[in-house]
Curated annotation (Swiss-Prot):
Known EC number: 2.4.2.7
The keyword Transferase is assigned to this record: yes
Protein's recorded name: Adenine phosphoribosyltransferase
PANTHER family: ADENINE PHOSPHORIBOSYLTRANSFERASE
HAMAP family the UniProt entry points to: Aden_phosphoribosyltr (MF_00004)
Main location: cytoplasm
Transmembrane segments: none
CDD domains, per the entry: PRTases_typeI
Pfam families listed in its UniProt record: Pribosyltran
A cellular component term, taken from the record's GO annotations: cytoplasm
Description of how the protein assembles with itself and partners: Homodimer.
Organism: Bacillus cereus (strain B4264)
SUPFAM superfamilies linked to this entry: PRTase-like (SSF53271)
Gene3D superfamilies: 3.40.50.2020
């Protein structure tokens, strides 16, 4: 399926100079959303995944249906102050600012094979931080899946040594 026809291009969002790739049209089309989910599920099945991890918020949109289809758990990665129990944290930079990400300390057991999902790979800051959280808990990053990669931002360099699936590139 050509997923690009289901991704809207929004200039100057969330701030001037950023060209945002909006996946909500893909989510609004049940067949396209299912096809994207199915492609990631097939990728994950080859990697013997124990848990899916996704950073908020769009990583949830991708990761939850994948974890459901695989019949494995989903562990959310959230901004500081959004998870109610004991967490580990990591500072990170992203395309348009800096922030802190967290995950529950008990979200991943040592040795578990993890699939990280997110909507978009831009500069790689969010995914690099998510990898650090997973690995600090002893998880093994068995795969990383994105709907979209912005190749001109060179975020892929953060992922050397990791197995990556991207459905569409810009």
């Amino acid at each position: 399926m050509d997923f690009k026809q289901h991704i809207a291009i929004v200039p100057d969002y969330p701030k001037e100079g950023i060209v945002f790739k909006d996946i909500t049209p893909l989510m609004n089309d049940g067949k396209a959303y299912k096809a994207a989910t199915d492609a990631i599920v097939e990728y994950a099945k080859e990697r013997d995944i124990d848990v899916v991890v996704g950073p908020e918020a769009r990583g949830f949109i991708i990761g939850c249906p994948v974890s459901y289809a695989l019949e494995v758990g989903f562990a959310p990665v959230r901004k500081l102050g959004k998870l109610p129990r004991e967490v580990i944290t990591v500072d990170y930079g992203k395309e348009y600012g800096k922030d802190v990400l967290t995950i529950h300390k008990d979200a991943i057991k040592p040795g578990q094979r993890v699939l990280i999902t997110d909507d978009l790979l831009a500069t790689g800051g969010t995914i690099e931080a998510t990898i650090k959280l997973v690995e600090e808990l002893g998880g093994v990053v068995a795969g990383i899946a994105f709907l979209v990669e912005l190749t001109y931002l060179d975020g892929r360099k953060m992922l050397d040594g990791y197995d990556v699936l991207v459905l569409e590139k810009y």
